[in-house]
Amino acid sequence: VDNEIKALADKERLPVSLVQLDVIDETSVKNAIQSIMTETGKIDVLVNNAGYGLSGALEELTIDEIKTQFETNFYGLIRTTQAVLPIMRKQKSGVVVNISSGAGRFGYPSGSAYVSTKFAVEGLSESISYELEQFGIKVVLIEPGFVKTGFDRATISSKKSQDPHSPYLQMMKKIDAASSKMVQNGCSPELVASAVLEAVTSNSPNLRYLVGKDVEGWVKSKKSMSDAEFHQMMAKGLS
């Protein structure tokens, strides 16, 4: 990935410096922020994009699998945010962009762990938007649907869900097939990047930016339908 970024930066003649950072490592986060401050003296934008998917029925997920999911998707985001907030507060400016998901708006089968992390990110982001407004710091949620990236390949299936004798095996097969099709029809990563750019360059950014026709449709249905109707619609898609 580093080589790809460097190649793209060279092609576009962009002055890009790469700094290694592991969101689950407190020391790594602190060292990265210190390195950036030494080089630039300020931090205007933080984009929390680290994350992965964990797929599996709740009954078959281990507590350790769920904890690891939260460690990256939620606690990692908190680590980086806490590290930059004193800097942005002193500057009296800054934008924190949290890459959430349509999964931060509604649940779906096999996604209990992943969805829970995104619901947590949504709640945290909305809460700190009030806290940070007084310091000129803006908070933004980017909520993509399916995107044509390698995220589907980075999604991990719980160990037990791969058991051929799993009572959830047929459900998981249907979900995997449906997800693969949706990724193929998903939006481009450039569309997500455009939403981020719009948010960080706006004087008054929205709290939430939905990205993708699929997620726009689902959220619209979620708002207009009763819980029972939305449940039936989602279940029908797996039948």
Question: Language model features by range: what are they?
Answer:
Residues 57-58, 65-67:
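Substrate-binding pocket helix/loop in short-chain dehydrogenase/reductase
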Residues 101:
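Residue(s) in the substrate-gating loop at a strand-loop-helix junction
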Residues 21-31, 63:
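The beta1-alpha1 cofactor-binding region of Rossmann-like NAD(H)/NADP(H)-dependent oxidoreductases
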